[in-house]
């Protein structure tokens, strides 16, 4: 059996209660019964209960969170920790003086698991920020102190059960927006937007700290300008670096429509970063990879997005992606894409959803791996929509992410508009699988 409960209650405009919990009777349930095509790649189910409260200066959160591991190849020691409970608070006080803000972030979490190290982590970060800006530029300086303490159990003999890490975080951020009119009629606006962020975080030895919920995200333009290269409180990356970026946009003067956006970014290290996660390689380089992004929306109904990551030390590309989309109306779309990540992924992806008439629409997707020289995923489907009900049927053939075997599934969903639906949640699957997909609009009553 499968149970999926989602419920949100607002006690007042500033208080929200949330329950989001799922459970299956056995690990193979999704493969055997196909409850939603996306279920074939799920490794664990989330069980969350949360309360949030917002006031003028404070945001408060309390939650408990557990997971049901349903991937038989994933051991309990590799799965996520149970959170029993977590209490977090974020306070902000603006304009204490001209341009001066203050903040306080605090979090206490009890991490539990059947095997390995568990315990309580308390993370506190007070900070101040000052910002001065004009119409075309800004300068922002930030200073924070981050202290993290642990009370651990089931540690290795001789290990510290109450480690503590404390350090300052200093940053100086600045940017400029330069503009000029271009085009024969001066109806286009080109911008040049350089940005620089200097970040200093002293080194603290963190090899003895556990890893409860911390990871290093893939490098991107957002990551270049964060004050911590890790997500999660178990690691704070040391830094003595300068991140530089520049963006240029082409805009319509009258309506503000963006035709083109191009961005380059790179970080320059004055000292080698030394903080690492257990499986993270040693960093010995003077710069980060070079990141480039291009977004083109100049042509009616067409859009394109390009991304590229270049490793200057190895003189090779680490990541590249190209996505094209043709969308002449909200109910019709064609996508084509290419994605490459060194030693991991190289694949083509083509998808489409197109009306056959006022009530019928066809759709499909094909994903092919160039590295493995085989089709990873393909499906075709039909959708019928009227004023009162909709019917969707999808046939799919794909490589299982769990076993590597080829699986075949057929999904059927009947939706009574405004009431409920019966069968697999194929609409949610289609929204995830086809960029720009939206359900057919309701046909008029006959």
Task: Enumerate the predicted regions with their spans.
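Outer-membrane beta-barrel proteins and related beta-barrel translocases across Gram-negative bacteria
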Residues: 1-446
């Amino acid at each position: 059996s499968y149970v999926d409960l989602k419920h949100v209650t607002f006690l007042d405009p500033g208080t929200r209660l949330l329950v989001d919990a799922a459970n299956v009777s056995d690990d193979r349930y999704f493969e055997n019964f196909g409850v939603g095509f996306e279920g074939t790649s799920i490794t664990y189910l989330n069980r969350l209960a949360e309360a949030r409260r917002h006031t003028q200066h404070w945001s408060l959160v309390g939650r408990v969170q557990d997971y049901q591991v349903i991937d038989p190849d994933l051991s309990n020691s590799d799965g996520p920790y149970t959170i029993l409970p977590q209490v977090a608070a974020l306070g902000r006080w603006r304009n204490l003086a001209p341009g001066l803000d203050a903040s306080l972030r605090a979090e206490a979490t009890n991490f539990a698991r059947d095997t390995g190290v568990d315990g309580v982590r308390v993370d506190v970060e007070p900070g101040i920020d000052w910002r001065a800006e004009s119409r075309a530029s800004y300068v922002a300086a930030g200073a924070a102190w981050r202290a993290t303490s642990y009370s651990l159990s089931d540690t290795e003999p001789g290990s510290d059960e109450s480690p503590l890490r404390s350090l300052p975080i200093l940053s100086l951020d600045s940017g400029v927006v330069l503009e000029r009119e271009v085009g024969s009629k001066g109806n286009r606006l080109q911008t040049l937007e350089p940005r620089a962020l200097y970040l200093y975080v002293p080194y603290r030895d963190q090899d003895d700290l556990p890893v409860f919920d911390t990871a290093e995200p893939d490098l991107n333009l957002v990551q270049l300008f964060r004050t911590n290269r890790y997500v999660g409180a178990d690691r704070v990356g040391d830094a003595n670096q300068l991140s530089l970026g520049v963006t240029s946009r082409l805009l319509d003067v009258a309506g503000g429509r963006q035709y083109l956006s191009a961005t380059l970014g790179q970080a320059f290290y004055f000292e080698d970063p030394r903080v690492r996660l257990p499986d993270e390689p040693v960093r010995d380089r003077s710069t980060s990879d070079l990141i480039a992004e291009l977004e083109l929306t100049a042509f009616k109904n067409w859009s394109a997005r390009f991304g590229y990551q270049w490793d200057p030390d190895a003189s090779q590309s680490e990541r590249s992606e190209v996505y094209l989309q043709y969308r002449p109306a909200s109910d019709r779309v064609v996508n084509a894409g290419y994605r490459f990540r060194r030693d991991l992924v190289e694949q083509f992806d083509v998808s489409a959803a197109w009306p056959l008439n006022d009530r019928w629409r066809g759709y499909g997707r094909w994903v092919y791996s160039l590295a493995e020289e085989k089709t990873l995923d393909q499906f075709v489907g039909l959708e019928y929509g009227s004023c009162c009900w909709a019917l969707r049927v999808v046939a799919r053939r794909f490589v299982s992410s769990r076993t590597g075997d080829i699986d075949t599934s057929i999904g059927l969903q009947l939706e009574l508009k405004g009431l409920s639906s019966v069968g697999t949640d194929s609409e949610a699957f289609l929204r995830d699988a086809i960029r720009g997909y939206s359900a057919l609009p309701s046909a008029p009553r006959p």
